[in-house]
Design a protein with these regions (language model features):
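Amphipathic alpha-helical
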Residues: 7-26, 178-230
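Charged, flexible boundary elements
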Residues: 17-47
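Covalent nucleotidyltransferase
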Residues: 38-175
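Flexible glycine-rich surface loops and low-complexity tracts that mediate binding to linear polymers
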Residues: 86-104, 209-210, 238-240, 283-302
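Intrinsically disordered, low-complexity regulatory tails
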Residues: 108-125, 130, 134-135, 261-327
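Short aromatic-glycine-enriched beta-strand elements
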Residues: 243-254
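Short, acidic/hydrophobic/Gly-rich beta-strand patch recurrent on exposed beta strands
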Residues: 252-258, 267
Length: 327
């Protein structure tokens, strides 16, 4: 969590190991050719979804949902029995994303609509009707004890194969849990073709995963993000009021990376309703998702971002990306 005193949890724990419990979470690495070159083929090219990262933790026959930072996600009973049934008698953790399927639709809602509802689950304000719209796509399965330990040595190919088998046993009628769309690729060229195909269809991209990769509580070098646009999560350190017709509304947010090295003002991407609403709220210290074209030096010689655009407030995160993870 953010300690509100100029240091984060990881810094405190470097001084006194284990002082503050940290929630386990394996992250993907942003695209770097040197990392991609180390991927062993055949590998998995999996569709990158636009939902909310979550864990379904099944223990002692009960299920709870947590965000990537360990905050409880309230779904008012939705999906609990489904995950308990999938787990059987095993204590385990399902890793994936929550998505929203609106009534009458046969496809998932767009990111803004879906995450608007999912953020309510994160805040504990979701209604039963909204919770019933939530579905899950999953891509990993980790034994509970190894999840808590922060390391599972079983290769991803074995973990995912087990997950595929148990998810496939669900009845087709009314199912709400799905395996992530996944393709086994023999070469990097095949992965790039799938990536370009998804972009053309309006999806975000792929995660390329090495089948030999272990699960570990850190940023993995065996799971690589391929994205059409660059994206990062920054901390809001200040806000600016709009000018002219935008007086009395949010004009821009001033953001920084976790280490304060990357700094940028983000003024585009907000609609009028958001500008009015956010000006009433205390946005300072919140985490925000920003898309951009490239990392640059500004006129003052500081690291910044070219063409930054607001995407959403990340209520599921407490800590921004470090500058080394912003390409």
């Amino acid at each position: 969590k953010d300690l509100k005193c100029g240091v984060d949890v990881s810094t405190a724990n470097k001084v006194w190991s284990g002082l503050i419990p940290e929630y386990p979470c394996m992250l993907c690495s942003p695209f770097e050719q040197k990392l991609v070159d180390k991927i062993k083929f055949p590998a998995y090219a999996q569709m990158k979804m636009d939902g909310m990262r979550f864990n379904a933790i099944v223990r002692d026959g009960k299920c709870e949902f947590r965000s990537r930072n360990g905050k409880e996600i309230l779904l008012l009973g939705n999906l609990e029995q489904e995950f308990i049934s999938l787990a059987g008698s095993i204590d385990c953790v399902f890793d994936g994303e929550l998505l929203v399927m609106l009534e009458g639709d046969h496809q998932f809602a767009d990111r803004q609509t879906g995450n608007g509802i999912l953020n309510k689950a994160n805040k504990g304000t979701i209604s039963a009707k909204e919770a019933a719209l939530v579905h899950a796509t999953v891509w990993d399965l980790i034994p509970y004890v190894q999840f808590i330990d922060g390391y599972c040595g079983s290769p991803y190919s074995k973990r995912y194969s087990t997950l595929q088998a148990i998810v496939a046993k669900q009845k087709s009628d009314g199912r709400k849990i799905w395996n992530v769309t996944s393709t086994i690729v023999e070469t990097l060229e095949e992965a790039q073709e799938i990536f370009q195909g998804y972009l053309a269809e309006g999806f975000e991209g792929i995660i390329l995963k090495d089948g030999a990769g272990v699960w570990e509580d850190k940023r993995s070098k065996t799971q690589i993000k391929f994205k059409g646009e660059l994206e990062c999560d920054l901390k809001i350190v200040a806000v600016e009021e709009g000018k002219g017709k935008a007086v009395g509304m949010l004009g821009a947010i001033i953001c920084e990376s976790a280490d304060g090295i990357v700094k940028v003002n983000v003024g585009s991407g907000f609609n009028d309703a958001q500008r009015k609403q956010y000006w009433k709220e205390n946005l300072v210290d919140k985490i925000v998702a920003v898309k951009y074209n490239s990392r640059i030096k500004n006129k003052a010689g500081e690291d910044s971002l070219f063409l930054p655009v607001f995407i959403e407030i990340r209520n599921d995160k407490d800590i921004a990306d470090k500058s080394k993870d912003i390409k």
